[in-house]
Curated annotation (Swiss-Prot):
One of its GO terms (molecular function) is sodium channel inhibitor activity. Expressed by the venom gland. It comes from Tityus metuendus (Scorpion). Pfam families: Toxin_3. Has the structural arrangement of an alpha-helix connected to antiparallel beta-sheets by disulfide bonds (CS-alpha/beta). Belongs to the long (4 C-C) scorpion toxin superfamily. Sodium channel inhibitor family. Signal peptide: none annotated. The lineage of its organism: Eukaryota, Metazoa, Ecdysozoa, Arthropoda, Chelicerata. SMART domains: Knot1. Keywords: Disulfide bond, Ion channel impairing toxin, Neurotoxin, Secreted, Toxin, Voltage-gated sodium channel impairing toxin. The keyword Manganese does not apply. Inhibits voltage-gated sodium channels (Nav). It is found in: Secreted. Residues 2-66 form the LCN-type CS-alpha/beta domain. This is Sodium channel toxin.
Length: 69
């Protein structure tokens, strides 16, 4: 298992945005939907961060986000 920023798809490599003021469990629910233990909205990046993701779950790599893929 790993702790990391989930991405929508591995090809796009875009982190999942979240509202830092009104999270309402959005990231936690998203992460649990990806079979992680939990998740939260990391305020400095305004992106979801997951704890305990399966090793094969797509996460942010060093490349740029490519929303047009």
């Amino acid at each position: 298992k790993k702790n990391d920023y989930p991405v929508d798809t591995a090809k796009r490599n875009c982190m999942l945005d979240c509202n830092v003021w009104d999270d309402e469990g959005y990231c936690d629910n998203f992460c649990k939907g990806r079979k992680a233990e939990s998740g939260y909205c990391y305020k400095l990046k305004a992106a979801c961060y997951c704890y305990g993701l399966p090793d094969d779950s797509p996460t942010k790599t060093s490349g740029r986000c490519n929303p047009n893929v």
